[in-house]
Amino acid sequence: MPGVPREVIEHRLAVRPGARPVRQKLRRPAPERQAFIREEVARLLEAGFIREVIHPEWLANPVVVPKANGKLRMCIDYTDLNKACPKDPYPLPRIDQIVDSTAGCDLLCFLDAYSGYHQIRMAREDEEKTAFITPIGTYCYTTMPFGLKNAGPTFQRTTRISLGSQIGRNVEAYVDDLVVKTRNQETLLLDLAETFENLRSARIKLNPDKCVFGVPAGKLLGFLVSARGIEANPEKIRAIERMRPPASLGMCNASLAVWPP
């Protein structure tokens, strides 16, 4: 996948001068998770997102975590590398303002970037700092991996560069969460055409299976939004309704700790 051109943006690691590289020792996860790591490494190699590396100074371990849908995801434990990098001060938008801005929009389009972070390349001189160790070898990322301290601000910069003329007008973006907001059906296609043209210019690809177009309501950053504003999320309501009533004073106190007055 070609991804965003380097001249537009690439992810750099501003490692503090004098920071000592850390090489984590190989961890041995359960056999089924080792098998999943092997599959992920093969997939990432084929996609060109990682490459083999020899004698890296920094070395981290992969971690397998469950996703909301029950499937597994391989992340890298960049705790040590992240400690050596100062926080990027680039501002992220306020979630409440993004959510509130969708009120009054009759139709919404929710867009999902295909392998979002991997569409941004790592700076070549920083690739080997992302190295990780597995039972079958050591690898580093050629694209921006999930888990790096400042990956979010870098992606926010990317959306600001590509959609800057639209943000606040007919598009809102929080890192890789994008929503096209349309006041009425007559302008829907115009708003989408403008968005697609800008994304195409930046070579940002979308995942059509995860995009939703022209709907009156949908989930955005954990909220259910519509033309009326924020609405109660049915999934969260069901979770509360399914809770067992407290059967002891201790359980009552625990409930009060979760929902303080």
Regions found by a protein language model. Give the residues of each.
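Retroelement reverse transcriptase polymerase core
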Residues: 1-261
